[in-house]
Structure formats: structure tokens, C-alpha cells
Amino acid sequence: KSTGLSIIEMSTFFENYRPDAVLVIADRFENLAVAIAASYLNIPLIHIQGGEVTGSIDEKVRHSITKLSDIHFVATKRSRDFLIKMGENKKTVFLTGCPSIDIASQAKSKLPKNFFVKNRGVGNVPKYKEKYIVVMHHPETTKFTQTYNQIRQTIDATVKIRNIKIIWLWPNIDAGSDIISKQLRVIRENKLMTNISFFKN
């Protein structure tokens, strides 16, 4: 339903503003709506990070956006080769790398004092100069009915870690994310792990 409504709204937006081109990234359902709207209005579509294989519903969305796109900026040689095998003209496929790596390389080595609170951190304030583990668990979109068992396995493995700080990133908003969020709140509210910090994204 969200995708359908987004197509309607984006079609109106593009009709009003007539952009020279539209840039979309990866495999989010909202980007599929953008891609469909732009394509049917004959607006050139540029896709970042096509050709990646995940084995989930996201992969179907990503490949659908690829087939609607006119120009492709891929992150890896493997992705480039995959798009060409899918029938894309190699003259329209450019190996540019992953934009997120560029962002990470520009990250500040010294964080501001209020970084934790400003970025919606919850729990103990981490000491970034010490060793820490980053944990992130998103629901598997094609098997979201198994989310509870999967997050419990991740939590059970994580609670055994006591001698190192853990920074846990909140899940995305895909189907099953509410189950993950609820289990993380149980840990947080009951203070079951004193060495953990949470970041909501």
C-alpha cells in the first residue's frame, strides 16, 4: 500500500518539477516507487549499488530498479559484471564504489562530547577509544515470521560477552522490526547487560 501511494505522489511531484534526472540508491521499497514514477514519465533514472545479491525481497526490488534505470553506478566489479549479464548495456554501467565508504572515511576521529545523546544513544555512554563490538540485527523480510527466534539467538549469544563494550544499532522498519525492538527494550529496561549501548537510527 505504501509503495502504491508513493507512486501516485511521486508522479505528481515529477510532473510538477520535471527534473533532468532522478537518482535512487539500493533496494528500498520507496525507491522502487520513485523508479516506477520516473520511468513512466520518461525521466532518466540513475541507480546506485545495483547488481548486489542478498537472497531477500530486497534483491527483487534492487533488480527491478535496475531494469527501470538508464545509468548504473555500481559498488563492485562483481556487481558490474552481474548487471551486464542481466542485459544492461556495459556503456551505461560505471564502477564507482560504495558511497557509504566515502562517508565513513570522512568520519571524525574525535567525536564531540554530546555525540551519544545527540544521536539518540540509550544506555551507558561508550568509550570509543576502548575496544567494542557493533551489533545490528534486521528482520529477514522473506522470513519475518521467524524474527523472534532469530533475535533471541542473537541476544543469547551477545549476553555471553562481558569483557568488551557492545554498541547495538536499532533495526530498520521492515516487517518484523517491532519484534526486534521489543526484545531490545527488554534488555535495556531490565538492565540485563551493563556493557551495552543502543543507537536508534
What is each of the regions a protein language model found here?
Residues 9, 82, 103, 153-157:
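Alpha-helical scaffold segments in soluble metabolic enzymes
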Residues 23, 46, 73, 94, ...:
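Hydrophobic/aromatic beta-strand patches that form the interior of the parallel beta-sheet core
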Residues 61-63, 108-109, 182-184:
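Short low-complexity, flexible loop/linker segments enriched in glycine and/or proline
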Residues 55, 100-103, 176:
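Generic structural signal for helix capping and beta-alpha/helix-loop junctions
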Residues 19-22, 46-50, 69-71, 107-112, ...:
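Short linear motifs at secondary-structure transitions and domain/linker junctions
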Residues 1-90, 97-98:
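Active-site and donor-binding regions of nucleotide-sugar-utilizing enzymes
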Residues 69-147:
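A nucleotide-sugar donor-handling region in carbohydrate enzymes
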Residues 1, 112-201:
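Donor-nucleotide binding loops and adjacent catalytic segments primarily
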